[in-house]
From Swiss-Prot:
<dbReference type="InterPro" id="IPR024083">
    <property type="entry name" value="Fumarase/histidase_N"/>
</dbReference>
<comment type="pathway">
    <text>Amino-acid biosynthesis; L-arginine biosynthesis; L-arginine from L-ornithine and carbamoyl phosphate: step 3/3.</text>
</comment>
<keyword id="KW-0028">Amino-acid biosynthesis</keyword>
<dbReference type="InterPro" id="IPR008948">
    <property type="entry name" value="L-Aspartase-like"/>
</dbReference>
<protein>
    <recommendedName>
        <fullName>Argininosuccinate lyase</fullName>
        <ecNumber>4.3.2.1</ecNumber>
    </recommendedName>
</protein>
<dbReference type="InterPro" id="IPR029419">
    <property type="entry name" value="Arg_succ_lyase_C"/>
</dbReference>
<keyword id="KW-0055">Arginine biosynthesis</keyword>
<keyword id="KW-0456">Lyase</keyword>
<dbReference type="GO" id="GO:0005829">
    <property type="term" value="C:cytosol"/>
</dbReference>
<keyword id="KW-0963">Cytoplasm</keyword>
<dbReference type="GO" id="GO:0006526">
    <property type="term" value="P:L-arginine biosynthetic process"/>
</dbReference>
<dbReference type="InterPro" id="IPR020557">
    <property type="entry name" value="Fumarate_lyase_CS"/>
</dbReference>
<dbReference type="GO" id="GO:0004056">
    <property type="term" value="F:argininosuccinate lyase activity"/>
</dbReference>
<dbReference type="Pfam" id="PF14698">
    <property type="entry name" value="ASL_C2"/>
</dbReference>
<comment type="similarity">
    <text>Belongs to the lyase 1 family. Argininosuccinate lyase subfamily.</text>
</comment>
<dbReference type="InterPro" id="IPR009049">
    <property type="entry name" value="Argininosuccinate_lyase"/>
</dbReference>
<dbReference type="InterPro" id="IPR000362">
    <property type="entry name" value="Fumarate_lyase_fam"/>
</dbReference>
Length: 462
């Protein structure tokens, strides 16, 4: 007869029901079911290889584990709080099906190293998927930039018009952020892809196991080096949570920009109806809810990172039950990041860019004032003096309700006699853009270079 709890031999009474409910993690870590089976299969194959269990029993266990996995995928495995966690659920199901032989599956293993294995397998798969989603989004941004290679818009500092830039240059800034995100996830993959199994509870095992065989079976790059550290380590999860928080911060900034640019006050872009919603009372409203949710859910990913850091901050070595709390943080952040990346990608694919409104916005706000100062520098004026002169010119324009382009040469000369007729060509928006040729700047030729560099990065990325 199968015991209710597989570890209850040392206890003389049942645990309190309220504690069972408090202790159970099955409703959360059920998400690790497939990874737990994969790990158990590799572990049992190793036990057979090392003559720790007979070969025929090993095959029976492996075949039964696959049957259990198939039944789980078909919704045939029932579970509740009494199963405690996914590891106990699978082992109890195995014993129920093949009896005494099933009890050998946990030889030379602890739930302490077992759960780390499951989490590493899960994180590895999700890490690779997130990398693909990020690459897809970078590719979409590149295409959007190419479609708007010459579109001029105001660049902003302090949410005030600053200097003219190309929309392609602006949107590629987010591609660069995502590129850094991608590289962080690749580095995180290195931390993830190590086999922890064989560390057992904390001190390793007395059985003559082969950890490298398990690593090979599960396509890990190697094994962890210290069994105490292995069962205590959640750094790879923290790295993933940080990477997701950073990624979401980037997506949230894009969302904020687009929410602003989509308003009637800006009308730089128009979001597709598929990613907006209406109001229950105001029939005219088209709200950018998808972007607002990305912005809002970003806070959850920050909270998940801080939550796990707080759980781990004062834990003594090695394993402690506190670590059970890591999964909700992890699952929630990954789910948020996956959906956010997919939604932002679709928003960009369906985005309408209002080029005329962007250009019109550049006609006000003295967006070419820096170029006027640069013009004076070319005439031999020290930049700080040029800055002061242009500040006075802008003040004059504001007082007289004029733009820089509307001033006459004579008016310019009141402030500096070195200003000539050629100033108007110098401060035209098109020339303001074209002259910015420092590497990484907003001129069309350099933006095209940025695009080509990003394309080459994606082609070479592995």
């Amino acid at each position: 007869m199968i015991q209710i709890k597989l570890w209850q031999g040392r206890f003389s009474k049942d645990t309190a029901r309220i504690f069972d409910e408090f202790n159970a993690s099955i409703m959360v870590d059920i998400n690790l079911f497939e990874y737990d089976v994969m790990g158990s299969v590799a572990h049992v194959k190793m036990l057979s290889k090392c003559d720790i269990i007979p070969e025929d029993e090993g095959k029976l266990i492996v075949n039964t584990l696959y049957e259990i996995l198939n039944d789980f995928k078909e919704g045939k495995i029932e579970f509740d709080m009494s199963d405690e966690d996914v590891h106990m659920l699978i082992e109890k199901e195995l014993i129920k099906r093949i009896g005494q032989v099933g009890k050998k599956v946990h030889t030379a293993r602890s739930r302490n190293d077992q759960v780390v294995l499951d989490e590493r397998l899960f994180c590895r798969e999700k890490n690779l998927y997130l990398q693909e989603l990020i690459k897809n989004l970078i590719d979409t941004i590149i295409k959007l930039a190419e479609e708007n290679i010459d579109t001029i818009m105001p660049g902003f500092t302090h949410l005030q018009k600053a200097q003219p830039v190309l929309f392609s240059h602006y949107i590629l800034a987010y591609a660069q952020m995502l590129k850094r995100d991608l590289l962080r996830f690749r580095q995180n993959f290195i931390s993830i892809n190590l086999n922890p199994l064989g560390s057992a509870a904390l001190a390793g095992t007395t059985f003559d196991i082969d950890r490298f065989f398990v690593a090979d079976q599960l396509e890990f790059d190697g094994v962890t080096e210290n069994s105490i550290d292995t069962v205590s380590d959640r750094d790879f999860i923290l790295e993933m949570l940080f990477n997701i928080a950073m990624l979401q911060m980037h997506l949230s900034r894009l969302a904020e920009d687009f929410i602003i640019f989509n308003t009637d006050e800006f009308r730089f872009i128009e979001l597709d109806d598929a990613f907006c919603s209406g109001s229950s009372i105001m029939p005219q409203k088209k709200n950018p809810d998808a972007l607002e949710l990305i912005r809002g859910k970003t806070g959850r990913t920050f909270g998940n990172l801080i939550g796990l850091l707080t759980v781990l901050k004062a834990l003594p070595l090695s394993y402690n039950k506190d670590m059970q709390e890591d999964k909700e943080f992890l699952f929630d952040s990954i789910d948020t990041a996956e959906k956010s990346l997919i939604i932002v990608n679709e928003i960009l694919k369906t985005l309408k860019v209002n080029k005329e409104n962007m250009l019109l916005a550049c006609k006000s706000g003295f967006i070419n004032a820096t170029d006027l100062a640069d013009y004076l520098v070319t005439k031999g004026v020290a930049f700080r003096d040029a800055h002061f002169v242009v500040g006075n010119i802008v003040k004059y324009c504001i007082e007289n309700n004029k733009s820089l382009e509307e001033l006459s040469t004579e008016e310019f000369k009141r402030f500096c006699d070195k200003i000539e007729e050629d100033v108007f060509k110098f401060i035209s928006l098109e020339n303001c853009i074209k002259r910015r040729k420092s590497y990484g700047a907003t001129s069309p030729e350099l933006v095209k270079k940025q695009i080509e560099n990003l394309k080459e990065f994606l082609r070479a990325y592995e």
